[in-house]
């Protein structure tokens, strides 16, 4: 990953509201493939993922389907149970000392002209996370000033409704490298499951007014971004 030695940034950080909630940490890296280089980037991301997993790291790589940048965007995520575990990650960069296979990969990645870094940040989970192979839809919100707790409570209410229709929901808080954002992550085991859940949600009379509160009235803050990604097998 380009300049990974310098940009290992935490996607979610702890705050006054995460105490008692945090169940995991994620480091997130966005990359964009250059025209004609998508297949090369796919192979490069898979190679790094396989090295990381073989070393015991919980790593998932995704390709974006919908969102800014379209199918040229790629997402690399490292998951950790704690900051102590993160400090002992499989391809440790403490003192710039790497495992040999990871160092070779870093050199290959940084010399590649197939992609460019877009963003990196850290997150902290605010509930139990559901790592796995899913179709992933993400909505990132910026709570109104002084109303973080209100937005989080509304998001937790929404989670109950969505999970009642078959979605798995993860809630994260952005940290270092990003803003004070809340991220609502909708996980589906397949396209068919996603379609079934979405249709049920459209017909849910409890959700209809809450959807207006979020999107039309902007009662809980500003929508920062939304996108869909799927795992690179």
Regions inferred by a protein language model and the residue ranges of each:
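Sec-dependent N-terminal signal peptides
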Residues: 4-15
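Short alpha-helical segments used as structural interaction elements across diverse proteins
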Residues: 2-3, 219
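Short S/T/G/P-rich N-terminal loop/turn motif that feeds into the first structured element of a domain
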Residues: 21-233
């Amino acid at each position: 990953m380009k300049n990974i030695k310098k940009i290992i940034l935490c996607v979610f950080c702890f705050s006054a509201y995460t105490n008692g909630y945090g169940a995991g940490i994620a480091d997130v890296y966005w990359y964009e493939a250059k025209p004609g280089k998508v297949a090369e980037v796919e192979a490069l991301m898979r190679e790094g993922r396989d090295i990381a997993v073989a070393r015991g790291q919980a790593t998932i790589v995704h390709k974006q389907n919908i969102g800014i940048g379209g199918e040229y965007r790629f997402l690399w995520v490292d998951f950790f149970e704690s900051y102590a575990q993160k400090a002992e990650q499989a391809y440790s960069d403490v003192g710039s000392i790497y495992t040999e296979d990871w160092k070779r990969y870093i050199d290959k990645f940084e010399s590649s002209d197939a992609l460019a870094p877009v963003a990196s940040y850290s997150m902290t989970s605010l509930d139990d996370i559901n790592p796995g192979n899913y179709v992933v839809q993400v909505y990132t919100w910026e709570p109104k000033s002084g109303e973080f707790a209100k937005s989080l409570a509304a998001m937790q209410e929404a989670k109950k409704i969505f999970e009642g229709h078959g979605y798995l929901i993860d809630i994260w808080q952005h940290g270092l490298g990003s803003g004070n954002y809340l991220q609502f992550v909708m996980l589906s085991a397949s396209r068919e499951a996603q379609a079934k859940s979405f249709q049920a949600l459209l017909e849910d009379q409890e959700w209809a007014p809450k959807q207006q509160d979020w999107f039309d009235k902007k009662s809980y803050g500003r929508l920062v971004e939304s996108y869909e990604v799927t795992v690179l097998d």
